[in-house]
């Protein structure tokens, strides 16, 4: 039996020591950790000695909203089979999903406002009237 632990806006926690341990040791006990960072530099700044270990122990790398060449180049280097130009020119409704030991794929981003599986599963948002 496994447990999924979602850490949205993970960088807001600051340097969170248990993240390293949970991504490496505790996965053997059935804990899956999904930390969400805004960009790679947040991970590198908070974990300068361990960011690569954390990244290497992630089962999936999901990327969307590539803002500039620096972000595109760094992400392309990590993914390996997608180039920076492709990332920079990616449509706003697309994402790259890189699963460990598999070729990265482009996929459509889900949109809860219009996708049928989400209908009736959320309250109206006055920001999207």
Named regions from a protein language model:
Residues 97:
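Conserved active-site motif detector
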Residues 92-94:
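Glycine-centered loop/turn motifs
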